[in-house]
Amino acid sequence: MENNDTPVFKKVESIIFSVLSPKTVKKMASAKIVTPELYDKEGYPVDGGLMDARLGVIDPGLKCKTCGAKLKECPGHFGYISLARPVMHIKFISVIYDLLRSTCRECGRILIPKKEIEKCMDELKNVEIECGPEERRLKIKEIIRTLKTINKCPYCKSRQQKITLEKPTTFLENEKRISPIEIRTRLEKITDDDCKVFGLDPNSVRPEWMVLTIMAIPPVTMRPSITLESGERS
């Protein structure tokens, strides 16, 4: 049998890494996980459980409830869990720490005047053109070090408090713990324009997305269950 498809060659110019928003996680998911139960008494996946058949199947005799395909044809589908309370994403703790110390605790603005912001953006642009993205990242770190020393907001004039981090994920403001709920609320106040000063593209990542309210659940095919000695699946 002849294959008449002509191969297409394209060059990848760039890759953009982003953080999934809660809205995106929900949109790409096929099921909401609401119960810790995995299988019913007959051994079939429980709807709304981590082995929900809408996330794909690992048993040869079953069909996926999302695409209708069997094990070999179904790639699997994501689900999601709505968290009862926001949770800090461990991989972004250092970024969150910098953002909290560099923005106003009241209005959320970056702690430098508007004219200085424009100057910073011009400098970052020139550094990237002349020296590359790595030098741009170093310049951003330099800007953040300067912001940490400012104790009064140039916009709302509120006094800033000292913020410290008790590893791995506990933030303190004047020795008082800041909850993930409050941290997320503060990060929501940061404007898209201010995000760019920190090297964040607001179209790909918003600061508040680093504090999880929705957790993506991988397809069943990525995490097959095992059978215990008792005959139960886990």
Describe each PLM feature range:
Residues 1-234:
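Conserved core architecture of multi-subunit DNA-directed RNA polymerases
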